[in-house]
Amino acid sequence: RDPSILLGRQSNQRFQFSGLAGKRVGVIAEVPTPWMTLQDDLGRAGVSLDDIDWVKEQSMAENAAALRAGEIDAVQIFEPYADALVQDGTGHVWHRCAVRGDSCWTSFYTTTAFTEREPETCRALVCGIERALAVLHKDSPLDTARAVGDYFPDLDAADLARMIHG
């Protein structure tokens, strides 16, 4: 599922994509997929990209700072930036992009020749991801937070669990 979140400076319990018209919105610049899926969501909602003042060249950290400074109205952002903005009162969750449903975020590309030459390697890769996902769906957010906590030394387990839970 899409891990990006749209946060705004004001509470917006009845968010609709059309409400972004006329707003200055910072989008994720570090990787292309969140911007592509947001464009698709907007198109499906009948919203023209030209009606929104986009900030496309800043990092998520820079967009978080810009939201805090009142320089932009909304951000498309990942954790832990989203949680930090919500916890300090600057950001309000407008939309969790995960509601769009399953999407292909972990993808592996190879040639037909490699697949034919190394079928067991390909199968092992897919089976490994399947096993990892099964564990993630079985464990509680706190268990998952504890398992991956060493990768996020600046976050305590409770905060990380809150982010994992969404």
Question: Which residue ranges define each predicted feature?
Answer:
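Short, glycine-/small- and polar/acidic-enriched structural segments
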Residues: 1-66, 73-79, 92-96, 102
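A bilobed periplasmic-binding-protein/Venus flytrap-type ligand-binding module shared by bacterial periplasmic
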Residues: 3-14, 105-121
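Solvent-exposed, polar/charged alpha-helical surfaces in well-ordered, non-transmembrane soluble domains
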Residues: 18, 36-40, 65, 69, ...
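Short polybasic/polar patches that bind polyanions
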Residues: 43, 86, 150
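N-terminal secretory/targeting leader peptides
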Residues: 89-92, 153
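Active-site-proximal catalytic alpha-helix in oxidoreductases
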Residues: 103-110, 126-130
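Secondary-structure end/capping motifs
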Residues: 116-166
